[in-house]
Curated annotation (Swiss-Prot):
The lineage of its organism: Bacteria, Bacillati, Cyanobacteriota, Cyanophyceae, Synechococcales. GO terms for biological process: arginine biosynthetic process via ornithine; L-arginine biosynthetic process. Pathway: Amino-acid biosynthesis; L-arginine biosynthesis; L-arginine from L-ornithine and carbamoyl phosphate: step 3/3. This is Argininosuccinate lyase. HAMAP family: Arg_succ_lyase (MF_00006). Gene3D superfamilies: Fumarase/aspartase (C-terminal domain) (1.10.40.30), Fumarase/aspartase (Central domain) (1.20.200.10), Fumarase/aspartase (N-terminal domain) (1.10.275.10). It is an enzyme of class 4 (lyase). It comes from Synechocystis sp. (strain ATCC 27184 / PCC 6803 / Kazusa). The gene is argH. It catalyses: 2-(N(omega)-L-arginino)succinate = fumarate + L-arginine. It is found in: Cytoplasm. The keyword Lyase applies. A mutant overexpressing this enzyme grows faster than the wild-type strain under photoautotrophic conditions with 5 mM NaNO(3) as a nitrogen source. In contrast, the growth of the mutant is similar under photoautotrophic conditions with 5 mM arginine as a nitrogen source.
Length: 461
């Protein structure tokens, strides 16, 4: 077994099973490029402050870049005996450049090193996810633009309530994604702070320049307290919270896609490129994409809860428990990324809205009942009185097997003399939707304005 960096303190050797249990190289290799970036910045800072010579710093940088090339070429594959990515890099660096490689860890601990790596990693992944959110929003917006006057039943309690523009429905998810995009931007700012130079917990005796290394790494600032710097995982928890919300939004949309694709709704058809079949039932076309997204949402939420529980009992400063933050974080990042990609593809090419069925759906129920009450209220009838009257109309119409549009004018006027011929136009699905022209409503003019506003939001960086 490879000699541990810290083994001179001990007389015995580490039990192989404990070494395996302790090792994180199997998953923290994900951080290697960020570990190399942090080490390069640290080496340059050591030279700038006179702790090592410029020539030594150059050797360190060259060695670290060689490790990067080896990793990218698939030639750097440290085993579990290397313990973690930090030791693996340091050991390989020393093989490449000799004893000068042993100087890299001057004025640095693995505690501030890993904190730096994770922040660099998460900063990059946040940028990636924000772009994926933009791609998702762009497809939603494209669908909305082509379906302003396509109507779909709107629901409360999963019961038909009022018809809405399909574009209006899609834009609701656009706004959810917009909040997700904004939220990640705020979290990025709090992630973009450097703990490098905090040492193990108390800082260092060397005359380092933390601001210089932070500047080299693109951080906006440095932690003001070394204890906080090495022990803080607020940024990871905040990210997992934001990731959970993204998955909640995708899961809600997925649930609707699953319902809409069912024979009972039949609002959409699934294309062959985004559906699968059954191993036993030849007629089936299954909505696997939204079902998987719905399932993966719980996985990400579990990571959030796990991280909160992980942190709740940790005294300052660093504890080995924090090794457990990475697998949850890495998996949540990848799950959000693939889920956004899959949903974007599904919306772009995987579904077709069944226009005839949607038109039937908004015309076959009593979702225009509120408009009858509004009609009477506009003619001076107190709304609550109008509401009660229309409730009775719906009850008697159901008993007679009629819809509101089937009532004769005489039947309307027998209910209340305020009804006139224009009641029929007022309760058509198109008019019901068009009339809701309040700001943020489903009226066609409002939806067109919302699309224009969404385009402006999409151009934000």
């Amino acid at each position: 077994m490879t000699k541990k960096t810290w083994s001179d303190r001990f007389e015995g050797t580490l039990h192989p099973a404990i070494a395996l249990f302790n090792a994180s190289i199997g998953f923290d290799i994900e951080l290697i490029e960020y570990d190399l970036d942090g080490s390069i910045a640290h080496g340059k800072m050591l030279a700038k402050t006179g702790i090592i010579s410029p020539g030594e710093a150059e050797q360190l940088v060259q060695g670290l870049e060689q490790i990067r090339q080896e990793y990218r070429a698939g030639n750097f594959n440290p085993g579990v005996d290397q313990e973690d990515v930090h030791f693996a890099v340091e050991r390989r660096l020393t093989e490449l450049v000799g004893d000068v490689g042993k100087k890299l860890h001057t004025a640095r601990s693995r505690n501030d090193q890993v904190g730096t790596d994770v922040r660099l990693y998460l900063r990059a992944q946040i940028d990636d996810i924000r772009q994926r959110l933009r791609d998702f929003q762009a497809v939603l917006l494209q669908l909305a633009e082509t379906n302003v006057e396509t109507l779909i039943p709107g629901y409360t309690h999963l019961q038909r309530a009022q018809p809405v523009s399909l574009a209006h429905h899609l834009l609701a998810y656009f706004q959810m994604a917009q909040r997700d995009w904004q939220r990640l931007g705020e979290i990025r700012a709090r992630t973009n702070v450097s703990p490098l130079g905090s040492g193990a917990l108390a800082g260092t005796t060397f005359p380092i320049d933390r601001h210089y290394s932070a500047e080299l790494l693109g951080f906006a600032g440095v932690y003001a307290n070394s204890l906080d710097g090495v022990s803080d995982r607020d940024f990871a928890i905040e990210f997992l919270n934001a990731a959970s919300l993204i998955m909640v939004h995708l899961s809600r949309l997925s649930e609707e896609m699953i319902l809409w694709a069912s024979q009972e709704f039949s609002f959409i058809s699934l294309t062959d490129s985004c559906a699968t079949g059954s191993s036993i039932m030849p007629q089936k076309k299954n909505p696997d994409v939204p079902e998987l997204i719905r399932g993966k949402a719980g996985r990400v939420m579990g990571h959030l809860q796990g991280m909160l529980v992980l942190m709740k009992g940790l005294p300052l400063a660093y504890n080995k428990d924090l090794q457990e933050d990475k697998e949850a974080l890495f998996d949540a990042v990848k799950t959000v990324q693939v889920s956004l990609e899959a949903m974007t593809i599904l919306l772009d090419e995987g579904i077709v809205f069944r226009q005839e069925r949607l038109a039937e759906a908004v015309a076959e129920d009593f979702s225009n009942a509120t408009d009858v009450a509004d009609y009477l209220a506009a003619k001076g009838v107190p709304f609550r009185e109008a509401y009660n009257l229309v409730g009775k109309v719906v009850k008697t119409s159901l008993a007679a097997g009629k819809l509101l549009k089937d009532l004769t004018l005489a039947e309307w006027q027998a209910l209340h003399p305020a009804f006139e011929e224009d009641i029929y136009q007022a309760i058509t699905p198109q008019q019901v939707v068009a009339a809701r022209n309040s700001y943020g409503g489903t009226g066609f003019e409002q939806v067109k304005m919302a699309i224009a506003n969404a385009k402006a939001e999409l151009s934000q960086t």
